[in-house]
Amino acid sequence: MKAVVFAYHDIGCTGIRALAEAGYEIAAIFTHADNAAENHFFASVARTAAELGVPVYAPEDANHPLWVDRIRGMKPDAIFSFHYRHMLNDDIINSASLGAFNLHASLLPKYRGRAPLNWVLVNGEQETGVTLHRMVKRADAGAIIAQNTVAIADRDDALTLHRKVCAAAGELLAEALPAIKIGEFSEHQQDESQASYVGRRTPEDGRIDWHLPAQRVYNLVRAVTDPWPGAFGYVGTGKFIVWQSKIHYDRAAAKPGTVLSVAPFVVACAEGALEIVTGQSESGVYMQGSQLAQTLGLVAGARLYNHPAAVAKRRTRVLILGVNGFIGNHLTERLLVDDNFEVFGLDIGSDAIGRFIGHERFHFVEGDISIHSEWIEYHIKKCDVVLPLVAIATPIEYTRNPLRVFELDFEENLKIIRDCVKYKKRIIFPSTSEVYGMCTDASFDEDSSNLVVGPINKQRWIYSVSKQLLDRVIWAYGDKEGLRFTLFRPFNWMGPRLDNLNAARIGSSRAITQLILNLVEGSPIKLIDGGRQKRCFTDIHDGIEALFLIIENKQKNCDGQIINIGNPENEASIKQLAEQLLESFERHPLRDRFPPFAGFREVESSTYYGKGYQDVEHRKPSIRNAKQLLNWQPTIAMDKTIDDTLDFFLQSVEPGDAEE
């Protein structure tokens, strides 16, 4: 049987050797180039491939069409992925006659995602394991072929557990690979109700919070100890690293972070105390805890901190223009949850952001971006990140007010972009799924899909083209003048505070708001062209989390990128959306306050939108970039989003409004 392998790290080497021992013909091995910033304590897949005489490649993007064609040309029977860091696209997965298989270092469906080995220790789990499963679109969600459990001892740390997991992987593959080779294996679907997800960990995640119980701090220390970057704390302005620790439950209670003794070096936590057995100062060498306490100049009663004591915290200042809008107000809520951000906002109204007025990290001015240009320029200069969210984005306005769409969406936003260039500020710009237009691809890819629009006399494309031209201008500024930017493309985000019913009354709202108005008023639901158009509906909370990760940009990998943010799993026609909404409406506790359902009515788009309208039959995103760059994927089902959105609007209707 011929296999193509994607592999990295010790588990990658384990998988490759297991394939060779099972008699597989390995046509090629794909791995990652070594990163000089990493601690290379693990074996080299490239060296293993060379020892076996197998061709090895380390492309920056294995999903590129050129590599896909080469892999197809190899005619593999199976694809195997062992600790490879990137998602593989459908073209690669489907290139093998038997399919693609991934070895994941957890007992799926728990701990899907990145760094499960560290996370199980952080969370104090008593067992983990390895899972061989089929590869599907969603990360780590395919049918399970085999699993092997690994017990986690109280004294295990990341390295000892890593070795156990590698051994378990070898045992599992020794049994599973021969069975796959002869086609005698079974598989079962994962229980989605038991699924959990974890994200990539960074060195910053090793920061010790002394206000946690000692058990939690101990778990963190062992989860990130050498050869990982280590858990760390601060004495004054100095940073120190904890490599080994021990829990003490018999110490008298004290304020968290208080040094209880220096020989041994024991620190109070919220529950119990932690002995620092070994550690080092940031610029020092590995040493015993008591020597570390002496080196740091500590005495009993001194305090340790989570941050450098003498350094004032510098929050990231985020400027949101259009802060009262659907995305703006939800994003503000998410940013204010994190103490690292301060929000400055401008909008012509404040009804959706009233809950933030008075918050110490929220600063709002009521104004119009076409008038308050001096205020905007000053705050672009003052802030770190700029999100210009002001735009006319309702389809009926594209044909009803095309010039206003161009003036606001293009001309006013171009001024903001130029100010970001002038003051060298990072801009996160809301592109749109509309830029793909009538693209014929099964799923729309940020880097390869064509952007296809209709003739000039179809004015509905003025929004799409205005946004596309701004995308191109931003890209050019990034290429020629060093503008830091990310373009994000929302795909049909839905949720509470999307538009309002008054906007729906004049036809200037998104589809679901218009449908809810029909139900509230007892008028027929209008299905434009029969409601055949398919869209992928995305919960606002999923979308905002992705946008937050772009702003946070922990890995510094979002600059110069275009990122689709949508939910390919939530694809439905407008008619299906209306039918699901009706079901939710009929079972809602407030149903009896509203008139009877008046039925569906099919309407031609030219009658509803005007002669300049042209529709798109389908619009499905590829979210490969979001998965790779953000370690993000949507999790919220469409029916929950519909329920939440409907409930918000029904709760907002005052008695008597439905009869107006």
Curated annotation (Swiss-Prot):
Q: Which residues are recorded as binding NAD(+)? A: 347, 368-369
GO CC aspect terms: membrane
UniProt keyword terms in alphabetical order = Antibiotic resistance, Lipid A biosynthesis, Lipid biosynthesis, Lipid metabolism, Lipopolysaccharide biosynthesis, Multifunctional enzyme, NAD, Oxidoreductase, Transferase
Question: Where in the chain is the site Raises pKa of active site His?
Answer: 140
List residues binding (6R)-10-formyltetrahydrofolate: 114, 136-140
NCBIfam families assigned: PRK06988.1, PRK08125.1, PRK11908.1
Q: Please report which protein family the annotation says this sequence is part of.
A: In the N-terminal section; belongs to the Fmt family. UDP-L-Ara4N formyltransferase subfamily.
Q: What is this protein called?
A: Bifunctional polymyxin resistance protein ArnA
Question: From which organism does this entry originate?
Answer: Erwinia tasmaniensis (strain DSM 17950 / CFBP 7177 / CIP 109463 / NCPPB 4357 / Et1/99)
> Per UniProt, what is the name of the gene that codes for the protein in this document?
arnA
